[in-house]
From Swiss-Prot:
Transmembrane segments: none
UniProt keyword annotations, A-Z: Cytoplasm, Glycoprotein, Nucleus, Phosphoprotein, Proteasome
Main location: cytoplasm
InterPro entries tied to this protein: Ntn_hydrolases_N, Proteasome_alpha, Proteasome_alpha-type, Proteasome_asu_N, Proteasome_sua/b
Family: Belongs to the peptidase T1A family.
Gene Ontology cellular component list: cytoplasm; nucleus; proteasome core complex; proteasome core complex, alpha-subunit complex
Annotated NCBIfam families: PRK03996.1
Localization per Swiss-Prot or TrEMBL: Cytoplasm; Nucleus
Functional summary from the UniProt entry: Component of the 20S core proteasome complex involved in the proteolytic degradation of most intracellular proteins. This complex plays numerous essential roles within the cell by associating with different regulatory particles. Associated with two 19S regulatory particles, forms the 26S proteasome and thus participates in the ATP-dependent degradation of ubiquitinated proteins.
SUPFAM superfamilies, per the entry: N-terminal nucleophile aminohydrolases (Ntn hydrolases)
Protein source organism: Pongo abelii (Sumatran orangutan)
SMART domains, per the entry: Proteasome_A_N
Protein name per its UniProtKB record: Proteasome subunit alpha type-7
Length: 248
């Protein structure tokens, strides 16, 4: 029997191959990074170059789900559009029903449940996306969650998905400290530094979004990102000079 064709059938050694293939699709997608700061959550995405005549504003990997929640994704954009639309409708339905916005975990659990249903339904295939979902709860606590095609979800302090996820995650494991997220600017710089591990052409190929408590999602413009990149480069040069002085 061909176990990689049937979505709902396990192989003898316990694999659901279609789910694993969906996870492979994510590894070919743009790198996305999420970091939870003290009073801020930051999402950064590697921007792929667009065609000369294409409007790059139509190519977004970061989007708002509600006033207090947004997400970034890696994988198939068409699949992500379906998940995003379903999640937005659920946010609106929740607001109409209980007259309050969703918590970040609630909408993450909804997205994870939607993905899980597509792993055991005939005539469907798993969603080929992984998502980083960030936002603020009622008490002002910043949250960061990650979901994958199997329907699992976990809370994180910082995480990465997409083709460069391994390198970026290793960088974050080494550099994520309380001091590194002490201020909003430091948190933003940490995300940019993490993305620069896999993005070669500097700030022009980075999409960055920040969310603060009781404030709408803000997408940073290229000039703002370039300013941060210039500061990071300057800090690197100063550190190199200090090392050279110590060595001499």
């Amino acid at each position: 029997m061909s176990y990689d064709r049937a979505i709902t059938v396990f192989s003898p050694d316990g694999h659901l191959f279609q789910v694993e293939y969906a996870q492979e699709a994510i590894k070919k997608g743009s790198t996305a990074v999420g970091v939870r700061g003290r009073d801020i959550v930051v999402l950064g995405v590697e921007k792929k170059s667009v065609a000369k005549l294409q409007d790059e504003r139509t190519v977004r990997k970061i989007c708002a789900l509600d006033d207090n929640v947004c997400m970034a994704f890696a994988g198939l954009t068409a699949d992500a559009r379906i998940v995003i639309n379903r999640a937005r409708v659920e946010c609106q339905s929740h607001r109409l029903t209980v007259e309050d916005s969703v918590t970040v975990e609630y909408i993450t659990r909804y997205i994870a449940s939607l993905k899980q249903r597509y792993t055991q339904s005939n005539g469907r295939r798993p969603f080929g996306i992984s998502a980083l979902i960030v936002g603020f709860d009622f008490d002002g606590t910043p949250r960061l969650y990650q979901t994958d095609p199997s329907g699992t979800y976990h809370a994180w302090k910082a995480n990465a998905i997409g083709r460069g996820a391994k390198s970026v995650r290793e960088f974050l494991e080494k550099n994520y400290t309380d001091e590194a997220i002490e201020t909003d600017d430091l948190t933003i710089k940490l995300v940019i530094k993490a993305l620069l591990e896999v993005v070669q052409s500097g700030g022009k190929n980075i999409e960055l979004a920040v969310m603060r408590r009781d404030q709408p999602l803000k997408i940073l413009n290229p000039e703002e990102i370039e300013e941060y990149v210039a500061e990071i480069e300057k800090e690197k040069e100063e550190n190199e000079k200090k090392k050279q002085k110590k060595a001499s």
